[in-house]
Regions:
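Conserved, structured core segments of small domains
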Residues: 1-117
Length: 117
């Protein structure tokens, strides 16, 4: 088994465009999807991220506001899971509710295991 990180992008603007009832129904799909992963022993953790933040860049440690909501590459949340292999992790990601939106993206990354220190 390996650990994987899913990074969620896009879909943020849809909250403003939908009725509260439709948005609640969409959020319930997240609860069901993650609940199913938990029942199967696949879910390690997941959280949404606040839209505001700071970036620290380079050896001079330049601090800037960001990322910004209007950026297409903004990470809105993450999920960590376990899977037998990369292909299984990708299959798991295909059921993510963010993919209901045309701009929804799930980036799947395998977490490297470092040797014990």
């Amino acid at each position: 088994m390996s650990e994987f990180l899913f990074l969620f992008r896009g879909g943020d603007g849809h909250a403003l465009q939908q009725s509260p009832e439709k948005w609640q129904a969409h959020m319930q799909k997240w609860v069901q999807w993650m609940g199913g992963l938990k029942e199967k022993g696949k879910l390690l953790g997941a959280q949404p991220l606040n839209p505001s933040g700071k970036t620290v860049t380079g050896s001079k440690k330049v601090i800037a506001d960001g990322p910004f909501m209007e950026g297409k590459e903004m990470v809105g949340g993450y999920l960590m899971c376990i899977a037998d292999n990369f292909d299984e992790a990708v299959e798991i990601s295909k059921d993510c509710p963010i993919l209901e939106f045309a701009d929804g993206v799930v980036e799947v990354r395998e977490i490297q295991q470092l040797p014990s220190m």
